[in-house]
Structures are given as C-alpha cells and as structure tokens.
Design a protein with these regions (language model features):
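Conserved structural motif at the start of ABC-family nucleotide-binding domains
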Residues: 4, 18-19
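Conserved ABC ATPase signature
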Residues: 130-134, 138
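Catalytic Walker B motif of ABC-type/P-loop ATPase nucleotide-binding domains
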Residues: 155-158
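H-loop/switch region of ABC-family ATPase nucleotide-binding domains
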Residues: 190-191
Length: 220
C-alpha cells in the first residue's frame, strides 16, 4: 500500500474548487516535486494532505501506519512569523509538541531530538540566537529542523527556497537530498523546477490534468 494516496480528490476553499480529479500514490522513500502554474492548487493540495484544509470531495489515504500527526510540514512564512521573537532552540523544540501529549513540558528525549535535527540542518551553532535576527536561509533551515522533530518519515514543504539566494537554495536542496537518501519521504511544492528535479524521483504536475510521472517522463 502507498504511504500517501489521493483518490478522486478535489481541493479548494469552502465550495470553491481549485483542483479536482486528483489521483496519485506516493511511496515510502519518494522525493516528489509538485509543479504547476500559480493558482493550480499546489499549496492547497499540500494543506489538504496535512488536514489543514478539508477535501471538497474524494479522499487522502495514509498507509503503512502513517498518521497525520507524524508528518512534518514546512509552509510558507508570513511577515509576522519571520519576526517571531523566540530563540532558534525554542522554535525547533516546538516541533516536538505532538509527541508531548498531555505532558506540559519538553523532556530530555525531546531536547536530544531537537539537537540532532539542528545538527542535521546546520543550525546548532545558532541555537541561542533570536530567530528574527537570522537570514532567510537560516530561518528556513531552522523551520526544517522543527519539521523533522515532528516526523522521521515524511516532510511536506511549500516553496522552501522562495526568496533565498543561490547559495542558501543550494544548501537547502543538499539537506533535502541527504534526508531523502537516509529514507525520508519528501513532498515539495516548487517553482524553482530545474534544481528541484535534480533531486526528485517523481513529479506531480498540476496542469490541466493532475498527473504523477517520473522525472524522465516530465523532462520528455
């Protein structure tokens, strides 16, 4: 069974359909790049997979025992979020909230996980810094570390390199590729198609029809 599957899915806001007739399967270990024009429903689809938006019709089915609370998510930042006055370590630790349950504090295991993910994303040396003082690339790596605290299996990312300079973008892609090689399933929305496809294994093209294909088929 697929890790994540859509069956005759329609997504949108309220009764307004943004994209429909969506069928796909994502398997464990895939690196899926979601592409399409502005307004084609890419971000809406990711939010629907995460249950941040309800489907208008159809279903998103999770397999292999995966729960939505076990999926990490890195969404697009607002200006308010970029200016959040917390330390890097506090931001990353907040990714452990799902595992806390009714426990009103972070334990030693949570802190070890946060530290390990700060190492993986190269932000451990920034742990005491205020988040809003960081560069855009540093902030994105902090948010990725937080998302990794929420999941060891699947990460969904919405335009993770938008607004980053070429060096910061390349570093983000390197980290994502390393995560995928270690077994993490990556699902990423991107307008930065060429570099994204260097690492992707599949493309979900949300054109006139939503089609899942190999990178080779997408490149023609």
């Amino acid at each position: 069974m697929a890790l994540i599957a859509a069956k005759d899915l329609a997504v949108g806001f309220g009764s307004q359909v943004v994209a429909d007739k969506i069928d796909f399967e994502i398997n464990s270990g895939d690196f899926v790049c979601i592409v399409g024009e502005n307004g084609s429903g890419k971000s809406t689809l990711v939010k629907t997979i995460m249950s941040l938006l309800p489907p208008i019709s159809g279903h998103v089915v999770l397999g292999e025992g995966l729960k939505r609370t076990e999926m990490g998510y890195l969404g697009q930042q607002t200006d308010v979020q970029r200016d959040f006055p917390a330390s890097v370590e506090e931001i990353v630790l907040s990714g452990c909230l799902n595992s806390c349950g009714k426990r009103p504090f972070f334990n030693r295991q949570d802190r070890k996980l946060a530290e390990a993910n700060m190492v993986r994303t190269g932000v451990l040396n920034l742990r005491r810094r205020c988040y809003r003082e960081l560069s855009g690339g540093q902030q994105q790596r902090v948010l990725l570390a937080r998302a990794l605290c929420a999941s060891t299996r699947v990460i969904l990312l919405d335009e993770p390199v938008t607004g980053l300079d070429p060096v910061a973008s390349a570093e983000m892609y390197r980290i994502l590729a390393d995560l995928n090689r270690s077994g993490m399933t990556i699902v990423m929305v991107s307008h930065d198609i060429a570099p994204a496809l260097e690492h992707a294994t599949k493309v979900l093209d949300m054109g006139k029809e939503t089609v899942m294909m190999s990178v080779e088929d997408y490149n023609g």
